[in-house]
Structure formats: C-alpha cells, structure tokens
C-alpha cells in the first residue's frame, strides 16, 4: 500500500510510520536474541591481520552480533524517533 500510494504521488499515510516502528522493534529484538544465542562469545571486533594464523574466537556469528546490535539500536532514531512516529500516527489516525 505504501509503495502504491507513493507511485501515485499520494501521501503514504500512517502506515509508513507504523511499519517504521514495527521494523525497528523487530530488528532490535532479533539482534537481542542473537546476543543471547552467542552468549560468552560476543566480541565487539576481531580484526583480521594479514599473515595471522589466529583462529576466530567462538562461532562466526559472534563476530558480527554486537556490531549489528549497536547498529540496529540506531534504527529507532533514524528517520524520526519512535516517539515522533507514534505522534504522527496519533495525529493522522486519531486526529489528536
């Protein structure tokens, strides 16, 4: 619906704000679950050094779990904070 409205040159309505909030919350929950799954192997960064024979510590998912978590925390701010998006929905749907 959102893309169809935009292609017709119309305002996407409150759906885009709702989808933004749902997507941000879902992404954050998924990365929180990934951190729990990786457990003690959470590492913020393991840079590869040329010529190094060091093996990565823990499962390969552990090397990106923390950066993804931090990156997706910003998704609730980017494009307007969740609170701003909720205010937009309240104005458009409820007329507040």
Indicate where each model-derived feature is located.
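Alpha-helical interface subdomain recognition
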Residues: 1-96
């Amino acid at each position: 619906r959102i893309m169809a409205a935009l292609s017709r040159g119309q305002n996407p309505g409150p759906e885009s704000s709702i989808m933004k909030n749902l997507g941000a919350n879902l992404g954050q929950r998924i990365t929180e679950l990934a951190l729990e799954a990786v457990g003690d192997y959470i590492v913020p960064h393991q840079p590869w050094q040329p010529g190094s024979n060091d093996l990565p510590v823990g499962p390969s998912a552990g090397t990106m779990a923390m950066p993804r978590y931090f990156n997706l925390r910003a998704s609730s701010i980017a494009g307007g904070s969740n609170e701003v998006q909720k205010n937009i929905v309240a104005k458009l749907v409820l007329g507040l």
